[in-house]
Amino acid sequence: MKDTEKKTEKELVWDECVDILENVKANSFKATLEYYLASDKKTKKAKPAKVKKVKEPKAKAVKPEQVKPTKTTKAPKPKKPKKQGGLISQWKEKLEAPYRTPYVEQKQGMVISIDKMWKHVHGEDSKEQIAILSDVSLEIGYGEIVIILGPSGSGKTTLLNLIGGYDSISLGSCVVANCPLEKCTTEQLLTYRKLNLGYVYQRYNLIELLSAYDNIAISQNLIPKEQRHLDIEELAAKLDIKEILYKFPYEMSGGQKQRVAIARAIIKEPRLLLCDEPTGALDSNSAENIIALLQAINKEYKQTILMVTHDETLTRIANRIIKISDGKIVSNELVRPLS
């Protein structure tokens, strides 16, 4: 993956849902990033060009005596239409090929395998490179709840973004769900995220113009109908948001918004749920409810959960606690093995 300009959280959310907005119930939604980011710019619709009517020349009448008799011949046999299946499958193959992710084997039971991974950024002097993650090696098993602790600027969110395929790896390897992220193109990373990831942000990042139902439906539409096992209304009932399902984000409390964001993340049944400070913007009661909810989700859906946080109280639900300082893992402890 090539280095790209750092995107805002809202732009990352937009990248994840822009391809499937046409499937959402809100017909009035204007699918442009500028409108989503509350830009004042207005786009003008181009007027259709006027098409001049062309008069067709009248056919000249032919007198009967001018028509010469012709010899009767046998009608040719109709040619069998050529089969188009081969061409269609080739065309489909060309369209899908750029999005097909590479595959490598992992140890049995492992969902994340990181080996000597580095992340460099350019400093104020463009010639100088600064390491914000250094020589990170890590293995995480399916179904673990992993808490990543560390002070601000230690590299916690960078690690989460690299695992999520939102940032490029400078050196080393990062294999998630058999997909080597360092070898992926931008298109392949999009497929990787659609198939494997759910992301919960600190500031919820719900689309303000859509109801809770439609915010969740955006994520559900990333997977084919035949692969959907969760119903939005049933999931909403489990997450205690059924009463606000058709309300808009501005009508919700912080805790309700975070529950909708979690529902949006897990509706497509991802293998990995990434949470960036999931309780950071909540009061203590709402935070406790979200902690209990994440624990219940892990138990019921067997999803691996990675949480970046400053809140050490979250460690009580962890299987694994990772501490990061100055871009290095200083501690990686399995505190509660999976049963």
Curated annotation (Swiss-Prot):
Keyword Magnesium applies: no
Binding site residues for ATP: 150-157
Annotated transmembrane regions: none
Region (Disordered): 41-87
Pfam families reported in the protein's UniProt record: ABC_tran (PF00005)
SMART domains in alphabetical order: AAA
Basic residues biased stretches: 42-53, 74-83
Molecular function GO terms recorded: ATP binding; ATP hydrolysis activity
Comp. bias intervals (Basic and acidic residues): 54-68
Domain ABC transporter stretches: 112-338
Sorted UniProt keywords: ATP-binding, Nucleotide-binding, Transport
Family: Belongs to the ABC transporter superfamily.
This protein's name: Putative ABC transporter ATP-binding protein MG467 homolog
Organism encoding this protein: Mycoplasma pneumoniae (strain ATCC 29342 / M129 / Subtype 1) (Mycoplasmoides pneumoniae)
